[in-house]
């Protein structure tokens, strides 16, 4: 086991502070509309250019092990804020640095770190209560576009596209971000329920040009087992053939005699039919088949429920306005299920999302939710170079997270104004001693820091003067760093999601509090690099006869 170094008291805390400052100073240059880019070297490929705080934070690795611990603690603030709210990572980093800096001064002067932390925690609770009071729900498409625009570093094109996508697929709809083939950024909406299973045979195609099978007003047979024997499928085929309407068969697998018979009848024109595999695997497959059944007003024919395929009637079949199937995907549009059943299923899935513990499960449940509630929007991001593409895609993903957060918890004035207004929440906080009161004052001072940094990044205005003027103002009055004017921030479209501001403050205070109450830091002792041993013998290998040279 490697030897360890132990650093106590001020020595350890100061080393941690150096690490915190190095990381925070690299991250905070990206804050606000006047924030700068950071270029990150990569071992392979072109360097990454970014203005995203968490991307910068994740790349910082310091040589000194104790400094590196401080940097990694603050990196955790940025990562956690990004995971929960999707944005606000730079604000969280700036707040963490400010709280730790102010707190460390007081600990060095003899304050009790535990009481300081208690005071900080009480202050944060008071500020968050006030933030929720001043928060207001997002009103319209324009405000969604403004949130997206601010989060994408004032790129109004991205803000408008996200607002349009949300309008088309609803607030619960799935919006995915993909790389475009060309230079144009565009929005594509897939309406209805789409799942990633195509036709089982190209002979089912109805349009040879597009290689698609299009069924108008079809019946939909949903079966959770394999179909290989034609005998069990025949009764329901005869019933649908008599109706004259097409039939889509969704089953775990259709093979052998059953598939061959379907293809032959399709080619002869006896049946308008198409067969696809059921989407998903295991329990998720059962759930998705149930979703399709509810959307189309059908029943999953399952022996577990006592239904048999040979006894199926037209009443078991789902119906839809149209179904389009290509070699990879099937899309069901205008399912004929009842609105009440679909709403009940959506609420059931929402409850499962809240209870889900893994990100993967949550993502899959959200996808099912979107498919039931109206569709999937795809943002295809175009750029001229790969470096620009990666940077733009990261900004779009940030903006998308931020707009979702705004829809969930509402919005507050941006540009650091909401935190300054939320200071009034400290007036009702009860403290037990002077050190806790100092913790309160640390938060009061730290809440000004994001605005100071936004102003500092403009490089033209004095931060203290701006902070004083904003504090004298009321409500949404603040400093718009983009135009360098004082105005109503919400009217100017400078808005932040409440969730982003709240999460940034909570995470910053949590990690800064842990750092302040640290009394010892244990790190691995760096090992001295040993010289490789000399090979035995006096001669140089491969140069025979020279061993005796002097």
From Swiss-Prot:
MF (Gene Ontology): ATP binding; ATP-dependent protein folding chaperone; isomerase activity; unfolded protein binding
Keywords noted in UniProt: ATP-binding, Chaperone, Cytoplasm, Isomerase, Nucleotide-binding
SUPFAM superfamilies in the cross-refs: GroEL apical domain-like, GroEL equatorial domain-like, GroEL-intermediate domain like
Region (Disordered): 526-550
Gene Ontology CC annotations of this record: cytoplasm
Biased composition (Gly residues): 537-550
One GO term (biological process): protein refolding
Pfam families reported for this sequence: Cpn60_TCP1
Subcellular location as annotated: Cytoplasm
Class of enzymatic activity (EC top level): isomerase
Annotated ATP binding sites: 30-33, 51, 87-91, 415, 496
Keyword flag Nucleotide-binding: yes
Catalytic activity: ATP + H2O + a folded polypeptide = ADP + phosphate + an unfolded polypeptide
EC code: 5.6.1.7
Family matches, as HAMAP family: CH60
Summary of the function given for this chain in its UniProt record: Together with its co-chaperonin GroES, plays an essential role in assisting protein folding. The GroEL-GroES system forms a nano-cage that allows encapsulation of the non-native substrate proteins and provides a physical environment optimized to promote and accelerate protein folding.
Subunit structure: Forms a cylinder of 14 subunits composed of two heptameric rings stacked back-to-back. Interacts with the co-chaperonin GroES.
Protein family according to the UniProt entry: Belongs to the chaperonin (HSP60) family.
Name this protein carries in UniProt: Chaperonin GroEL
Lineage of source species: Bacteria, Pseudomonadati, Chlorobiota, Chlorobiia, Chlorobiales
Gene expressing this chain: groEL
């Amino acid at each position: 086991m490697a030897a360890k170094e132990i650093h106590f008291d001020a020595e350890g805390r100061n080393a941690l502070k150096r690490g915190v400052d190095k990381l925070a100073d690299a991250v905070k240059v990206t804050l606000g509309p006047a924030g700068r880019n950071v270029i990150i070297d990569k071992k392979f490929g072109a360097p990454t250019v970014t203005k995203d705080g968490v991307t910068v934070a994740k790349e910082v690795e310091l040589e000194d092990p104790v400094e590196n611990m401080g940097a990694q603690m603050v990196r955790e603030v940025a990562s956690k804020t990004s995971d929960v709210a999707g944005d606000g990572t730079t604000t969280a980093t700036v707040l963490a640095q400010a709280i730790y800096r102010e707190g460390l001064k007081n600990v060095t002067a003899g304050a009790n770190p535990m009481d300081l932390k208690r005071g900080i925690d009480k202050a944060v609770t008071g500020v968050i209560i006030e933030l929720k009071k001043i928060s207001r729900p997002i009103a319209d498409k324009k405000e969604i576009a403004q949130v997206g625009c601010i989060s994408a570093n004032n790129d109004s094109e991205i803000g408008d596209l996200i607002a349009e996508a949300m309008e088309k697929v609803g607030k619960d709809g799935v919006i995915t971000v993909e790389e475009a083939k060309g230079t144009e950024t565009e929005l594509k909406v897939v309406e209805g329920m789409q799942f990633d299973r195509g036709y089982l045979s190209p002979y089912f195609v109805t349009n040879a040009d597009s290689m698609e099978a299009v069924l108008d007003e079809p019946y939909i047979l949903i079966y959770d087992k394999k179909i290989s024997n034609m005998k069990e499928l025949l009764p329901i085929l005869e019933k649908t053939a008599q109706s004259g309407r097409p039939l889509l068969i969704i089953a775990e697998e259709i093979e052998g005699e059953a598939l061959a018979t379907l293809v032959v009848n399709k080619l002869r024109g006896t049946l308008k039919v198409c067969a696809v595999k059921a989407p998903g695997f295991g329990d998720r497959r059962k759930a998705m088949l149930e979703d399709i059944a509810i959307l189309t007003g059908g029943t999953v024919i399952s022996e577990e429920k006592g239904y048999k395929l040979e006894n199926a009637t037209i009443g078991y079949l789902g119906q839809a306005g149209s179904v389009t199937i290509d070699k990879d995907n099937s899309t069901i549009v205008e399912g004929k299920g009842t609105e009440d059943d679909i709403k009940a299923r959506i609420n059931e899935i929402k409850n499962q999302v809240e209870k889900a513990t893994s990100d993967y499960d949550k993502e899959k449940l959200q996808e099912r939710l979107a498919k039931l509630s109206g569709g999937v929007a795809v943002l295809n991001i175009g750029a001229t170079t790969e470096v620009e593409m990666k940077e733009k895609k990261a900004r779009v993903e940030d903006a998308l997270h931020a707009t979702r957060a705004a829809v969930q918890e509402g919005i507050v004035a941006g540009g650091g104004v909401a935190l300054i207004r939320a200071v009034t929440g400290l007036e009702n906080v009860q403290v037990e001693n002077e050190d806790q009161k100092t913790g309160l004052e640390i938060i009061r001072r730290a809440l000004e820091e994001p605005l100071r940094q936004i102003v500092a990044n403009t490089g033209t205005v004095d931060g203290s003067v701006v902070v004083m003027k904003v504090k004298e103002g009321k409500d949404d009055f603040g400093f718009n760093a983009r135009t360098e004017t004082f105005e109503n921030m919400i009217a100017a479209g400078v808005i932040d999601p409440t969730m982003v501001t709240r999460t940034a403050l909570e995470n910053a205070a949590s990690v800064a509090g842990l750092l302040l109450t640290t009394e010892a830091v244990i790190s691995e002792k760096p090992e001295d690099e040993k010289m490789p041993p000399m090979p035995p013998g006096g001669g140089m290998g491969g140069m025979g006869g020279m061993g005796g040279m002097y």
